[in-house]
Amino acid sequence: MRTFIKSHRRSSSLEACPPKTTPKRNSTGSPTELQPPVFPPSAPRQSSSFESLQKLTSGKLFSTKLFKKSGAQKLPATPDLPAFPRGYDSRSPSCEWRALGTEVALEDIPAIKGTRTHEWGENSDVSNSVIVLNRNSISSDGSYVETRDEQSPWRLARRSLDSATQTLSSTEEYSGPEIRIRSSTPHKLREASDSFLKKRWNRQARIHSKADIAKLEGSFPMPVEAISPPFARRRSSERSQCLGASGTMEQQLNPVNPEKCSLYAACSERSQSLTKATHALVATASTEVGLQNNLNSASVELRDDLENERESLSEEDSGSSFSDDSSKFSFEVGGGINGRTSSVKYYSKPDPPMRNYIDDLFEDEDFDEDMNCYDDDQEYEEDTEHLFGASHVQLEHGYSMMHEVTDSDSEQETKSNISSVLSKGQNAIFPSSDGRFVLNSGDSNGGSNQENIGVKMLEKSISNIGLEDVEDVEDDSDGIIPTDTQEDIDSPVHSQPSHANFSHIKKYSDIFGISDSDEDTANNSSSQYPFEEGYYSSDEEPTLRAEPAANTEDGFTDALKASFKQDESSHSSTDSIDKTPTFALDTDGEYFPPTLTLNKKSEVDDLDVSEEAAPESISLSTSDLEQPADAKQDRANIISSSIMDYAIHEVATTESVESDENQTTCVPQTTRVPSKVTKYADLFNLSDENDEDGSDGEFLDDMGFNELESTPVESKKPNIPPRRLGNEYFGNFHSPVASSHNAPAVPRQHSPLSAKVILPATENTSIKSQYAVPRMGQSPLPPPARSQTLKFHDLHSSLDGEIRGTMSNLFFIDESEEDQYYQVQSKVDDDYLDEINNVPEDFNFSDNDSDTCSGKSPMFPTGLRNSFRKTRSFSEKPTGLAKEPTPTRYKLDIKNKTVTFFKNGLSRPLSEGSLHGQSIPSRAHVPPLSLRKAMSEGSLEQSAHSPLGYGSLAFGLNSLKSPEMSRTDAYGLSPIQEAISSGDASPKLVN
């Protein structure tokens, strides 16, 4: 009895039946209204619980009486029974409409209908996407369908209203806001079941699980396509059919009072505000419920308004679903009744904005490498002022105006720097436009043309200086020597040629077409300028040029001309030599060439000097100048002595050097050719003898002599005339001036890339340091390296003077030859890669594969060959297919037996392992105690016929092995055959 009471309480709490006083309060109702509904016999009768049914059928507790009281035929005769019998399924969503038949207030509607998708923008309020909160179980819908007649479509629609899945899935009939219209059942019975209805609605507000959805699809008689896809917009034709059917049905409804009309209006407003015009307009009632004609018209008007609003919203939604395209979120809703999905997808813009990378701005925008913005006009103006001394306004008329632009500031600064180191009346020598040198005294008003200036200035300088003042002049005179730096002094003053001669220059490319004849014509026609200064464009700068033959009629000797000219043919063959002569001042204010050094290995040989080298002498073209014969030798001595100021570096000799009165010339020494280097491998064959000339040693400060070197162009010329120190002449020269001392001949050395001019060494020679701080803010020259020439490349820089060693030691190596040399000497890396790729990834590399102890010991079952087979990658030829990394299955299931493979590497006889010597066990694997006991006994029979402990196997009759001297090529696995009904052959543990 107690068990029955407990089961009864449990079922009552779930059903939440109304109190028994409910029929008593309904005293005014008719007897038909008080009767509970009659359920069809299709619903099977069940006991209240499984526990009570099991105990009652056992015959212990009043089985006959209890079954008679709980029968279905006793329900009409019992007036005090609750409205809902125990056998009724309380989870049925629509039983209240048939059982109670009362009006349900708005409180009965569940408070939560669903959640909306997250959107923003102007059209966020018009979206109709709803995430459905469904029931916890679907079995009630199936039971309801089984207990009701399934022919009425209105009951399907009514069930879809009660079920959250069917309501929001838009069934075939309607998709508007729901409005429930109830029958005229007494109000008192409805109030009694309010708590029960709320409890039921709260239980229905659940989200379907996948099991419920699968159960619903299998048990629900209505096709799934009728309610899928959810949230789909209804077509106008379907709406018209639904509205027509609803109007026909509404005419059959029972009339109601005006109070119910107001309740209907309130219900419609409340439902519309809750659902945002997304639910269906459905009229549900039983056969006993009806409406008046005015209610029919009101409901039709309400449906029309809702339909019009729905169409307008759908048009706006179809036009632009989202006002803000920066980001869109969408809840992906599955087809059918699967409800919502947990996936949230983000849709970015279809065309993202173009991103500006900084690399794209370098070519088109005004940015330097430090990402600093600058102005093109400002930079162009600064560049023109730096190069031409004029703004870009003066250059607007074309490239032809560039030839007439002068740099007045540079001109004044240059003349002031030169005049500060020249004595009064001395002249400066500047290159002309064709590469020739003219004398300039710094006075721009001295004449009207180049010829008058050259003659007058030269006559003035010669007349003021006599032969007896040569010693004084030599200390103050300046030599014109090209240097290898452009920073020592300002660039020469630009010339102003005739504008008519360059009128054909219209564009930048015309500058490259200017020939020497055009420049000569321009120089001859420019008589209105006070003097001709060296003109050259930015891409062709003035160079020292040579004439094919010497001209002795102009008053200048070949020695003077040789000091300023170079062979034009040699100049054309050596284009890579720097062609820009600049002028640098020595510490004492003298011009000197930086490429002239002294050779410590030079030896003085008594060689005859002939005058045959005179045609090769480089002369200065001054054909327009005519001087008296008396001044020729004086002028020659002055200029020659000034040129040699740097050549001897102010060598003060205490012992006189005797020179022959006869004219001497240089006799070249035998050429010394180093070892030929033709390829990269020849560099390793060079010996120390080839590096003798370019060996690293000390500088001039540690030597008593210097070595004069000239460029490869100057190697074809004889030596430069020497300078007279005191009353003695030092060195050899070719000059018509008679000398009372004999000078030994100076040998010359030749190399493929350089030529050395060697002067004889003298005793007690002291070198005056030339590295003191120069005057007038001029930068000092780099220290001349011993036995070296300037590096041979296109861009000349001051760093070349500091490179030690001769050019004979520098070789231009082809990179392809160097790569080929190393490819022959070493193995290609691809060969190693091929070998590595042929080895499987899971191959067990041992530390020492040749170790017999680790390869054949029973403690290490992985040998040389077994370690490779253990990888399970391949046993024959490697394949390039991807394989699953699944481990090897050691059990094979057949129909009648199961074969299991066990590793027997540790089950070998002790004598077999002892034949190879004692092995050291690994740290990772320690044999069990039973195995160690068996090994310590050393019995061959025991180890061969009895199991050896953990992991060992029970040998069969055919699995016995005799002791062997070497390991077999087996995989380390032995089979065990197990019968279906016998477990005797299974492995056993030995204690």
From Swiss-Prot:
Q: In terms of domain of life, where is this protein from?
A: Eukaryota
Q: Keywords on this record?
A: Cytoplasm, Zinc
Q: Which GO terms describe its cellular component?
A: cellular bud neck; cellular bud tip; cytoplasm
Q: Which cysteines are joined by disulfide bonds?
A: none
What family name appears in the similarity comment? Answer: Belongs to the ZRG8 family.
Q: What does this protein do?
A: Involved in maintenance of polarized growth and daughter-cell-specific transcription.
Q: What is the lineage of its organism?
A: Eukaryota, Fungi, Dikarya, Ascomycota, Saccharomycotina
**What is the name attached to this protein's record?**
Zinc-regulated protein 8
Q: Where in the cell is it found?
A: Cytoplasm; Bud; Bud neck; Bud tip
Residue ranges of the region described as Disordered: 1-51, 68-92, 165-192, 306-327, 516-546, 564-588, 603-631, 847-866
Q: Where is the composition biased (Polar residues)?
A: 24-33
Point to the regions of Basic residues compositional bias: 1-11
Composition bias of kind Acidic residues appears in: 605-614
